[in-house]
Amino acid sequence: MAENKTPLVAMTLDELKNATKELGMPAFTGAQIAKWLYGKGVRDIDEMTNLSKANREKLKAHYEVGGMDPIDCQKSVDGTIKYLFPTASGKFVETVYIPDGDRATLCVSSQVGCKMNCLFCQTGKQGFEGNLTAADILNQIYSLPEREKLTNVVFMGQGEPMDNLDNVLRVTQVLTADYGFAWSPKRITVSSVGVKNKLKRFLDESDCHVAISMHSPIPEQRAMLMPAEKGMSIKDVVALMHQYDFTHQRRLSFEYIVFGGLNDSMLHAREIVKLVEGLECRVNLIRFHQIPNVDLHGASDEKMASFRDYLTKHGVFTTIRASRGQDIWAACGLLSTKRMQESGEEK
């Protein structure tokens, strides 16, 4: 992107109206720009042909569309594609496109690295390098080659979305607004380890689905796996969820990586049943994908199936998530731009 120019991508309609008003353009120009951006996906201001040439030149003096193409991609044998996107700060983030029949999900990142330092996650080993701007986040969708095929977006890539909440909310607003992508909020899922105050604000200000990283119902063990337990316990997260209605369109899910010999016992299953009693939710069981220098191991398929069956039998809707893109380090817990830099894969 050009220096000293503001990206138009991720600007709200009100912001576009204010920007064009300051440049002396007609009142309706902001809405025209929004249609070019979010309706047509233009790459250059000169493509906005119903703006006069004089107004396009005014706009170009201060703004640019802001779309940045991925600089690298890797394709898995299962069809999953991992893209490497540049950011305004000069850093890079990974984004994963997951086709599945007539559905296509995009897993987007909200930060470069992550502060949460979960034991089992490669992104946490990268450390925290900074928040993405709203334009950085939305660009992962805006500049995706398969953009027109997308049916869902999940904020489950690099970073903790609640730790960059202002920008995440801005992006979900643009995605769901009539002037924007005009998506239903039920096409969007935002994940979190549980961040005090931020999680409540997200629930209040958004209608998108929410996915909570549980990984253990036992506080001491969860704290060992996820230091964020000390900031907001899983019990506090569940108590907060009881204040909201998940019986209609909005969905609540708990993510649970199953580690062999650690959190895969029937004791854990019973504790989950007790923990979520009376809460409309689902549990997604996830296979652990081995990362370097971490002494954790995945549970067997048989163990995962019996765990799922126990939860289901006791009224907790439970699925085993299919792993995708493991061969290109695109599966759950494997994203790390630092790993790509060190291996010389970045171009």
Regions found by a protein language model. Name each.
Residues M1-V93, H242-R250, V258-K347:
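Auxiliary Fe-S-binding modules of radical SAM enzymes
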Residues S76, S109-S110, S191, S213:
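Short linear Ser/Thr-Pro motifs
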Residues I81, V93, A104-V108, M116, ...:
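Generic beta-strand structural signal
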Residues S89-I98, D102-R103:
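P-loop NTP-binding catalytic core
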Residues P99-D136:
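Canonical Radical SAM [4Fe-4S] cluster-binding loop centered on the CxxxCxxC motif
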Residues A135, N139-R147:
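Ferredoxin-type iron-sulfur electron-transfer modules in oxidoreductases and energy-metabolism complexes
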Residues P145-N152, G157-R321:
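Conserved AdoMet/S-adenosylmethionine-binding subsite of the radical SAM
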